[in-house]
Amino acid sequence: SDPTVSRLIATLAADVRAVLSAINTARAAARQNAWRAAGAGAPDHGADGAHPVIIDLDATLVGAHSEKEQATPTYKRGFGFHPLCAFVDHGAGGTGEPVAMLLRPGNAGANTAADHITVTGQALAQLPMTTGYRVGRKVLIRTDSAGGTHEFLDYLTRRHLGYSVGIGLTGTWADQISNLLPQAWTPAYDADGVQREGAWVAELTGVLDLSG
């Protein structure tokens, strides 16, 4: 009944930190059992630097149609929330497995390093194969340009994580990339080793100034 649900929520709200800790512990235990039962089909089966578990971080806008707690105007001129989510990538044959989500008001910044660090830590705590602070390259964190901050990348480096992070190009960077010699470019390949049509990669270490 509604009164029962209301009383339960009130009870849980009395000690939010303890309740969230218990819920996250239960979720991690359930995931460990599920991945163990999946055997070779588990996301962490045979995970190493060449075949890492990939965690995707991305924020999304959730609309609210009335005045709700933490609902605020968004950068897209909407009204609602801006949670930051973490999903384990199950590959082309599967879907994303949610492992962490940080609830945020609609006006939360897209590239807030502290939020990306918080969600990454919560996501790693949900993985059965991550113990200790230095996780290693068996886990790769993937984000769009919202994760392209020095503070967040320094955190990933300290934890020895692999990462693939987008970054917005400035006019100067675009010119420097355009001036690369043809032999600097090599074909890009997808996860199955198939060459991607029209896609090329180049090593930019020492080419771009990333100190800003």
For every predicted segment, state its role.
Residues 1-5, 51-61, 96, 139-148, ...:
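Short, conserved catalytic/metal-binding motifs centered on acidic residues
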Residues 2-89:
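Active-site-proximal, Lys/Arg-enriched surface segment
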Residues 34-44, 117-139:
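Short, basic/hydrophobic alpha-helical segments
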Residues 65-70, 97-103, 112-114, 150-156, ...:
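Short acidic, glycine/serine/threonine-rich loops at helix termini
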Residues 75-132:
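Electropositive, glycine- and tryptophan-enriched low-complexity nucleic-acid-binding patches
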Residues 77-85, 158-173:
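Acidic, His- and aromatic-enriched active-site or binding-groove loops in soluble protein domains
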Residues 133, 153-162:
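Short, surface-exposed basic-aromatic patches at helix termini and helix-loop junctions that form
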Residues 164-212:
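An anionic, glycine-rich sequence signature occurring as long contiguous blocks
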